[in-house]
Amino acid sequence: MNTVRVTFLLVFVLAVSLRQADKDENRMEMQEKTEQGKSYLDFAENLLLQKLEELEAKLLEEDSEESRNSRQKRCIGEGVPCDENDPRCCSGLVCLKPTLHGIWYKSYYCYKK
C-alpha cells in the first residue's frame, strides 16, 4: 500500500512539475510573441501616422489655395464709377451710363437695378 502511495505521489509531483515547466515555457513564448507584435504594431503605427500627416498636409494645402482663390473680390458701391467692360458693382447694382450727375467725370457708374 505504501508503494502505491509513493508511486502515486511521485507521478503527481512529476505531472505538476512538467505542467509548471510547460506553463513557464508557454509564458516565455507568449512574451516573445507579444514583444514581436509590439515592434510590428509600433512600425505599423509609425507608418500610419506618417501617411496621415502627409494627407493632412495635402488637405491643408488645398484648403489654403481654395480660400485664396475663392475669396470674393471687392465690389463697387452705389454711385461709384465703374468700368463698362469689367463691372465690379456689388450685387443688386448695375454699371450704367449716368443720366445727369457725373457725365463729366466718367462715363459709367454703379446704380440700383
Curated annotation (Swiss-Prot):
GO terms for cellular component: extracellular region. This is U11-theraphotoxin-Hhn1a. Expressed by the venom gland. GO terms for molecular function: sodium channel inhibitor activity; toxin activity. Disulfide bonds join C75-C90, C82-C95, C89-C110. Its main location: secreted. Residues 61-83 are annotated as: Disordered. Probable ion channel inhibitor. InterPro entries: Toxin_22. Keywords: Disulfide bond, Ion channel impairing toxin, Knottin, Secreted, Signal, Toxin. Transmembrane segments: none annotated. It is found in: Secreted. Residues 22-74 form a propeptide. The keyword Disulfide bond applies.
